[in-house]
């Protein structure tokens, strides 16, 4: 990219980053003005990268970031919902960021969604779902669970905060924890049995017999499976 040896290239790179070509926060980092960084001006993906590295810790920014993210109702994020849960979260502020970014995704969806349709996610929890999902760094089950959590926040009425699980049997679950990260990490399934998707229809028939009105039912089911039927 730059002429000269490695040291010269790095110096040229730093000059580029400290110029008007880079984002403001990148310029501040290059100038070592870490305390002047405005986290609100950093894109969601970049913020995730910074908080999942040792950058905040190494530059004494952990408390500042924790105060910032606590003060936010939501946070920006433009990635896929499952990507939010793909990294370990050893720090409280990492979980707080994911919670706020998840809320941001939900708020965006509610602003643009078709109110005449709502979907409940049905998660395959048969044994094969523990395998790595192609194109990601997490399992098929974790991708499905993240999608189930996302769509459950868009449901209303009797099915609000719920999702379906199927293997040899079908169950309906209600998330029991408060925050998105608590819900995601505290819920686990037993990876057993086969894939009995027909059981989903039987479950809705049972719910109707228990007094659920068809008008309360979701308008559709999103089945998330690795396809090993």
Q: What are these regions, as identified by a protein language model?
A:
Residues 1-141, 153-229:
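Long lumenal/extracellular ectodomains of secretory and single-pass membrane proteins
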Residues 145:
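Catalytic core segments in nucleotide and nucleic-acid processing enzymes
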């Amino acid at each position: 990219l730059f002429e000269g040896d490695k040291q010269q290239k790095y110096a040229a790179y730093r000059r580029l980053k400290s110029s008007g070509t880079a984002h403001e926060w990148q310029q501040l980092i290059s100038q070592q003005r870490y305390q002047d960084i405005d986290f609100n001006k950093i894109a969601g993906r970049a913020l995730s990268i910074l908080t999942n590295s040792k950058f905040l810790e190494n530059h004494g920014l952990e408390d500042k970031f924790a105060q910032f993210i606590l003060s936010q109702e939501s946070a920006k994020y433009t990635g896929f919902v499952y990507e939010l849960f793909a990294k370990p979260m050893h720090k409280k502020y990492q979980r707080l960021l994911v919670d706020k970014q998840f809320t941001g995704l939900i708020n965006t969806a509610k602003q643009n969604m078709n109110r005449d349709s709502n979907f409940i996610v049905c998660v395959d929890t048969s044994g094969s779902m523990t395998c790595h999902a192609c194109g990601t760094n997490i399992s098929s089950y974790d991708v499905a669970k993240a999608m189930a959590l996302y769509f459950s926040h868009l449901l209303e009425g009797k099915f609000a905060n719920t999702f379906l699980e199927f293997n040899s049997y079908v169950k309906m679950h209600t998330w029991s924890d408060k925050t998105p990260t608590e819900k995601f990490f505290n819920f686990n399934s037993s990876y057993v049995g086969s894939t009995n998707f027909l059981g989903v229809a039987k479950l809705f028939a049972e719910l109707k017999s228990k007094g659920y009105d068809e008008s309360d039912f979701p308008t559709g089911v999103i089945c998330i499976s690795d396809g090993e039927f």
